[in-house]
Amino acid sequence: MASILTLDGLYAEVPKFLPEALREGCAGKNPLSFYIQQILNLMGCDGNEYHVLFTSSSEEANTHMIMAAVRRHLLRTRQRPHVIIGAAEPPSVTECVKALAQEKRCVYTIIPLKNFEIDPVAVYDAIQSNTCLACISGTNAVVKTFNKLQDISKVLRGIPLHSEVSDLVYQGCIKQNPPADSFSINSLYGFLGVGVLGMKKKVMQGLGPLIFGGGLRGGSPNIPGIHAMYRTLTQQRPSMKKINTIHKLFMKTLKKHQHIYLPIGGVSAEDMSAENSAKDIPSTDVPVGPKGLPGYILFSVGHRAEELQKKIFTKFNIKVGRIVDLQEILFRIKIPQKYWETLLFIQLRDNLTKEDIKRVMVVLMHLDTITPRGSLPPPSYSSSFS
């Protein structure tokens, strides 16, 4: 039975006979509406910002998006549309674009990998007056390195960005919640698999009528497959929604307290010690995070280091002076004694356990109850958080 996507992003028609087991959590609601909202929640997306279409696979979602963008451009002008694609895109993207180019319905530019990722500057340089779409995945095939989707989206300046984000979703990489105008996900669930095509409202208004014909038909609503996708997401990434909650609480606390940002990519403990000595700042003697990982530093203004150490590190069983072998990394950095502040470095990785989440939440909730006092200039070796 065909399903129709209405303008509010929900399916108007649903199967009338569903096994009770597949209605888990629906509480009498439209099953598809329920799954749409839950999947968006797991991704950390705003349900009011995105429209969702279920397809047979992410491959179908990718081709729908490319075809719609090319068709819209051809309807507006006789100039052949230009598509930007990454060098490590899935076959559904490259084959679709190349097939359209062979039919002389579009031209395309392939952006090569630089240091195993797509360089936003190269994307900017590839933009032409007839560019109608950029297809850059969240992770690059084979090498599985992350692309800077946020930066790429900025340089495109209004040109739609479509991204395959299956790996980002299944790895729980919340810091790259799809900033793309549209995204696709594959369920990774075998023969019952379905795909997801998510589109922001502004994209839906322009390209939506060109997808599935003018009627916005999304094919048969494969409820068992959609349910299986939802269950797979919740089982493989049981902490994804909580990770997003932690992230929001962390950002809220970060804005509340005075803070600094300490980039740690490629920095070793020895480098930090040498740099601190050079600037007359006491050495931390604390190892920094693994090379290449970003770092956030948060400190509470007006509270002595010993006070917060007792309340946080001792009470919550988190040791100072070493990287905790968990998914959150908390350590104290010494700065000139006249400031006597505590700096907390929190790094969220992709495989948090429930116990890890509880410990991070306890620390953040405690910090959220502290009222900032006074003012503290950041150490000269750190840059301000942006």
From Swiss-Prot:
UniProt GO cellular component terms: virion component
Cofactors that this protein relies on: pyridoxal 5'-phosphate
Record: residues binding pyridoxal 5'-phosphate: S58, E59, S184, I185, N186
Localization annotation: Virion
Principal subcellular localization: virion
Pfam families in UniProt: Aminotran_5
Gene3D superfamilies for this protein: Aspartate Aminotransferase, domain 1, Type I PLP-dependent aspartate aminotransferase-like (Major domain)
UniProt keyword annotations, A-Z: Virion
InterPro entries linked: Aminotrans_V_dom, PyrdxlP-dep_Trfase, PyrdxlP-dep_Trfase_major, PyrdxlP-dep_Trfase_small
Induction profile: Expressed in the late phase of the viral replicative cycle.
Matching PANTHER family: CYSTEINE DESULFURASE, CYSTEINE DESULFURYLASE FAMILY MEMBER
Entry similarity comment: Belongs to the class-V pyridoxal-phosphate-dependent aminotransferase family. NifS/IscS subfamily.
Protein name: NifS-like protein
Species lineage: Viruses, Varidnaviria, Bamfordvirae, Nucleocytoviricota, Pokkesviricetes
